[in-house]
Amino acid sequence: MWVLMSWLAFAAGLVAGTQCPDGQFCPVACCLDQGGANYSCCNPLLDTWPRITSHHLDGSCQTHGHCPAGYSCLLTVSGTSSCCPFSKGVSCGDGYHCCPQGFHCSADGKSCFQMSDNPLGAVQCPGSQFECPDSATCCIMVDGSWGCCPMPQASCCEDRVHCCPHGASCDLVHTRCVSPTGTHTLLKKFPAQKTNRAVSLPFSVVCPDAKTQCPDDSTCCELPTGKYGCCPMPNAICCSDHLHCCPQDTVCDLIQSKCLSKNYTTDLLTKLPGYPVKEVKCDMEVSCPEGYTCCRLNTGAWGCCPFAKAVCCEDHIHCCPAGFQCHTEKGTCEMGILQVPWMKKVIAPLRLPDPQILKSDTPCDDFTRCPTNNTCCKLNSGDWGCCPIPEAVCCSDNQHCCPQGFTCLAQGYCQKGDTMVAGLEKIPARQTTPLQIGDIGCDQHTSCPVGQTCCPSLKGSWACCQLPHAVCCEDRQHCCPAGYTCNVKARTCEKDVDFIQPPVLLTLGPKVGNVECGEGHFCHDNQTCCKDSAGVWACCPYLKGVCCRDGRHCCPGGFHCSARGTKCLRKKIPRWDMFLRDPVPRPLL
């Protein structure tokens, strides 16, 4: 039987698995071998499918003609090609084994499973609605739907019809794939299948955004879109192009498209899409990870069983996979002749783990921080910047940095012996100054002054739109007033209805502020001083706002007040402007 697991420990990677009676650890469960003397790792759901032993890859090749008769030449995850003793084989993720076509590799690559309907070993395409067979790659088709390239880590060609092996580039002019080892024929993609996934594979790597997760033994890396993808190896190095990654203890060389280390050189790896973090809600406060089942504990609290649609045992301590029965006297889950031992439960947490717990920052000083595994380096401005590798060498130009052991050269290069790589560009560090009272919080580290709106910027950080409740435009450079739509092509803010906007009530001005009104009264920065109906200075929460005659309301710049001051009428189409600027935390006095 299975114990209910903690989502916090699960997400933080603290759950090492199940310890078998012989001392070994397994990710899901332990099963007795046929002889009954030894234990091996198993998954009761996977073990009900047809199973055969995988074969070792043997000998390098470039085409099927380089392999013995009945063998196939397969591309491995490391970028090399090897002979598989099946006429139509599938390369396993460990890079050393292969399975026949129609089968899927086990996690350790030593077994092949033949699965029907929707195999768990399938590659899930972004959006989680379509999937490709194991050892395939998701690529966009001509019609915008998802297609499958029949090899792992493939390169998707720009024509949206063809693809090339990992490490090769598409030469559409000559209809071929070009790689350092030679040329290959372009491969055609086939349509992806609709996902009908009943059970999810366990994920134990939650990315810093707390919205994306990656499989165990992989690494979260940021993609060009700002979202997170998965590098298919643990403790990987995320390359600065946001497309590739390299093994641990290597350096990304984007000029040569290689991963460099002291002893060897390998091809860059392409990141895979991450999976959305989803929850199974037990009640309004407690949830379990996707693919788990909520079960009550003896205390009445909720616990998490690591299988979808699981059977909760009557002892309120254990659970079994779907289709199994709880045998509390034996302490097993049984389905026919198959028996597996049980484990103990733990309490389900109240919420998802805080991403700041999973990924601690690197402090530069008391007020500035860089992401984990980064190095703090000074910028030309004198502020702190972040070099995206640990223990880096900060170059004297205050723009670049180099890996540990390398020397900074002119024009942004790094050298170590005969090896030369491109230097990495620093990014601005995050300010950790706490929010001032009244400021608008963008995230844990950044805020905008009151009366403004946080908008994402081109740099991937936050910027401030100098309008309250504004609409942030898709180009990440502009913003429009609330209720308007950005027309990026026409560079205008548009509204389908009439040119009317409700006015804003004035607030009494403080004694101290940034904008001097007179008579000892001030308003905050990006506000406008207006006299109220009593003749006392008050503050309009718009920069260059228009004061209404009623002494109670005001309108944004570019509008004028109606006769009664109950409406803001637009004089003309709002001017497209560069509203965004860098956010600066300010005290409100």
Swiss-Prot record:
GO terms for molecular function: cytokine activity; protein-folding chaperone binding. Induction: Injury-stimulated induction in the fibroblasts and endothelial cells and by inflammatory cells entering the wound. Injury-stimulated induction in neurons. Strongly induced in activated microglial cells that surround motor neurons after peripheral axonal injury, but not by astrocytes. Up-regulated in response to a cortical injury. Up-regulated in activated glia during normal aging. Induced in response to inflammation. Gene3D superfamilies: Granulin (2.10.25.160). It is found in: Secreted; Lysosome. Disruption phenotype: Young-adult knockout mice are healthy and fertile, grow normally and show no abnormalities in hematogram or serum chemistries. However they show increased inflammation levels, impaired host defense, and neuropathology. Knockout animals displays neuronal outgrowth deficit. They exhibit increased neuron death and microglial activation upon central nervous system injury (CNS). Conditional knockout mice exhibit a reduction in dopaminergic neurons and increased microgliosis after CNS injury. Highly expressed at the wound site and diminishes away from the wound. Not expressed in fibroblasts and endothelial cells in intact skin. In adult brain, expressed primarily in neurons and in resting and reactive microglia. Expressed in both neurons and microglia. Highly expressed in activated microglia in response to injury. Expressed in macrophage. Glycans are attached at residues 38, 263, 373, 526. Its main location: secreted. One of its GO terms (cellular component) is Golgi apparatus. The keyword Repeat applies. The keyword ATP-binding does not apply. PROSITE patterns: GRANULINS. Keywords: Cytokine, Disulfide bond, Glycoprotein, Lysosome, Repeat, Secreted, Signal. GO terms for biological process: astrocyte activation involved in immune response; blastocyst hatching; embryo implantation; epithelial cell proliferation; locomotory exploration behavior; lysosomal lumen acidification; lysosomal protein catabolic process; lysosomal transport. Residues 1-17 form the signal peptide. Belongs to the granulin family. Secreted protein that acts as a key regulator of lysosomal function and as a growth factor involved in inflammation, wound healing and cell proliferation. Regulates protein trafficking to lysosomes, and also the activity of lysosomal enzymes. Also facilitates the acidification of lysosomes, causing degradation of mature CTSD by CTSB. In addition, functions as a wound-related growth factor that acts directly on dermal fibroblasts and endothelial cells to promote division, migration and the formation of capillary-like tubule structures. Progranulin is secreted as a homodimer. Interacts with SLPI; interaction protects progranulin from proteolysis. Interacts (via region corresponding to granulin-7 peptide) with CTSD; stabilizes CTSD and increases its proteolytic activity. Interacts (via region corresponding to granulin-7 peptide) with SORT1; this interaction mediates endocytosis and lysosome delivery of progranulin; interaction occurs at the neuronal cell surface in a stressed nervous system. Interacts with PSAP; facilitates lysosomal delivery of progranulin from the extracellular space and the biosynthetic pathway. This is Progranulin. It comes from Mus musculus (Mouse). The gene is Grn.
